[in-house]
Design a protein with these regions (language model features):
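Short, small-residue-biased leader/transition segments that mark boundaries at the very start
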Residues: 2-7
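Short, flexible hinge/linker loops that cap or flank conserved catalytic cores
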Residues: 11-13, 36
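Catalytic nucleophile-elbow at a beta strand-turn-alpha helix junction centered on a G-D-S/GDSL motif
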Residues: 15-31, 48-50
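Conserved beta-strand scaffold positions in the cores of enzyme catalytic domains, especially
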Residues: 20, 42-44, 152
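Alpha-helix N-cap/helix-start and coil->helix boundary motif
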Residues: 26-27, 49-52, 60, 74-77
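The serine-hydrolase catalytic nucleophile loop
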Residues: 31-32, 55
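Alpha-helical cap/lid subdomain in secreted, periplasmic
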Residues: 35-40, 57-198
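A short beta-strand-loop structural module common to alpha/beta enzyme folds
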Residues: 41-54
Length: 198
């Protein structure tokens, strides 16, 4: 994580640092569109394959210790895919709430985002009810955000397609991870929300 050292220094007064907390969708974003992060001074903290449990474990190091003005949290895809064990919506939702509360306790603003659509996971095809689980988790994240006056960015709506609630093939090659075109959609939404929040 050589690049991470650049951010170990504390932000200068006028700099409003923004950290993106996530999984391979965030990691791939930084790789696919590095300029979106560089130009805006955004810091990507996406680690491929991780679930919300693992996010919570590194939240202090990867978010709080960087003293950002704001954190964008995108969690849930790998939980539903059962990457670290059986999926429990209450636990995943609880981890997202814990991250939001940790941020707030450290005077870091929060933007919560929806889980992206996925009809299935190429590495876990036996999970047949991913769309229902994703919709249910998204509804809870959105309701929590609303109740706590936290901005919520809905990536799901503009990217979902068809009765099987898939990630639109225009925006993905594998049904889970966005392509450059998919990230374009996300960038327009998140940039607006960040500017409004700061």
């Amino acid at each position: 994580r050589g690049l991470g050292d650049v951010y170990k220094r504390q932000p200068v007064k006028k700099e409003k640092r923004v950290v993106f907390m996530g999984n391979s969708i965030t990691e791939g974003w930084v790789r696919t569109h590095p300029d979106f992060f560089k130009t805006n001074g955004y810091i990507g903290r996406g680690i491929s394959g991780q679930t919300s449990y693992q996010f919570l474990l590194r939240f202090r190091e990867d978010v709080i210790n960087l003293s950002p003005a704001l954190v964008v949290i995108n969690a849930g895809t790998n939980d539903v895919a059962e990457n670290t064990g059986a999926y429990n919506e209450d636990y995943t939702f609880g981890n997202i709430v814990s991250m939001a509360e940790l941020a707030k306790a450290n005077k870091i603003k929060v933007i919560l985002t929806s889980v992206l659509p996925a009809a299935e996971f190429p590495w876990r095809r036996e999970i047949k009810d991913a769309p229902q689980k994703i919709q249910s988790l998204n509804a809870r994240i959105e309701a929590y955000a609303k109740a706590n006056k936290i901005p919520f960015v809905n990536y799901y709506q503009p990217m979902v397609v068809g009765e099987n609630k898939a990630l639109n093939p225009q925006y993905t090659k594998d049904g889970v991870h966005p392509t450059g075109e998919g990230y374009d959609i996300m960038e327009a939404l998140i940039k607006q929300a960040i500017e409004k929040a700061l």
